[in-house]
Amino acid sequence: MAANTTSTAATSSPGGMSLSLLPIVLLSVALVVGLPGNSFVVWSILKRMQKRSVTALLVLNLALADLAVLLTAPFFLHFLARGTWSFEVTGCRLCHYVCGVSMYASVLLITIMSLDRSLAVARPFVSQKVRTKAFARWVLAGIWVVSFLLAIPVLVYRTVTPKNKTLICDSRYPSDGHKVFHLLFEAITGFLLPFLAVVASYSDIGRRLQARRFRRSRRTGRLVVLIILAFAAFWLPYHLVNLVEAGRTLAGWDKNSPAGQRLKLARYVLIALAFLSSSVNPVLYACAGGGLLRSAGVGFVVKLLEGTGSEVSSTRRGGTLVQTPKATPTCPEPGPTDSFMTSSTPPESSK
């Protein structure tokens, strides 16, 4: 998201003006849905959840990352509507840096959720030992530090340049090598590696649950597919366009050619689509709430997270972990926060 969020200004041609409406619509939907939705999630966890599970902490940070990027949407909407950047170089770099940090934080949080669930299913005793709030806070701190570091190239390459009597907040590279490096670096660290980890984790979960013939393995399998597809749907097109541009740059093709301009316009729309990823999670929580939404009202997020935080209670008797099933929500949570807790999964520590 940080690479080229405003690389193409609203053009004066009729086609360009028509195309610019789609990003405006997508950004507006993301803002209208995501801002109150994620704010509600943050409020629910901080104000209504007395004992926050590790899952709740991960969801809280994911909502905060989504809120951060959504707060930049008004600046980009202003740019799209006016066709010029009005917030100077500092605003240009800050907005895009926030987008970059949020992108990395969101992807890393989803990856950690996936690895957490895989460990809980594959190594329940190990998961019980390491899955504490203290350890989770260290992991979360590490995620944010890494996200701030990975987004630094945005601060280096972003600037405001004049173009056709307007100002554009764009990336400016000293050489084509710098441009290719940035595009590949963002695609690999911001999508490819995390996506491979998510796929590997949930594939392992599905395989193990199917082998154990758990009662809900079929539903879990469907959720795994939905999670992976949703993750890819918002981010894969954006990174593919960046990879194509990196290839064109290496081949020495003219970026001002008709094909190059179409590529810019495609990214123009896909970046706005990526913004929607910051608004989809609250919608998934509401859908997952089902009966909880009707019975618990505004407290459904708390009930949902309490249900997904631990589907079993565990006690040690004579050195053996004994699980006792608890009540579960009407449906498991679809999305990166789905706990996939089974009868082999230990509870979250309250440390």
UniProtKB/Swiss-Prot annotation:
Stretches of the chain found on the membrane's Extracellular side: 1-21, 78-93, 162-179, 244-268
Family of this protein: Belongs to the G-protein coupled receptor 1 family.
Membrane-protein topology: Multi-pass membrane protein
TM regions (residue ranges): 22-44, 57-77, 94-115, 141-161, 180-200, 223-243, 269-289
UniProtKB keywords: Cell membrane, G-protein coupled receptor, Glycoprotein, Membrane, Phosphoprotein, Receptor, Transducer, Transmembrane, Transmembrane helix
Designated name of the protein: Leukotriene B4 receptor 1
Compartment(s) where it occurs, according to its Swiss-Prot or TrEMBL record: Cell membrane
UniProt KW Membrane keyword: yes
Native source species: Rattus norvegicus
Compositional bias annotation for Polar residues: 311-327, 339-351
Entry keyword Cell membrane: yes
Pfam families: 7tm_1
Modification after translation: Phosphorylated by GRK6 upon leukotriene B4 binding; which promotes desensitization.
